Amino acid sequence: MEPKFLRAEEVAQELSVSKPYAYKLIRQLNEELKGKGFITISGRINREYFNERLYGARKEN
């Protein structure tokens, strides 16, 4: 089972970007989640939200 959250290292590797840029993306995505009323963890991003926002992939129920 995959962890629910991605760390900056995993985001950087997935997108082939630098670690500081990965942190910038995570901050931006976490701000979006905070705006929707979610609690966020600094330096980590929900895997499902990451995939939805970056790839447009939504999990069908």
What are these regions (language model features)?
Residues 2-21:
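Polyanion-binding surface elements
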Residues 12, 51-52:
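Residue-level preference for well-ordered alpha-helical positions
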Residues 17-51, 57-60:
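Major-groove DNA-recognition helix of helix-turn-helix-type DNA-binding domains
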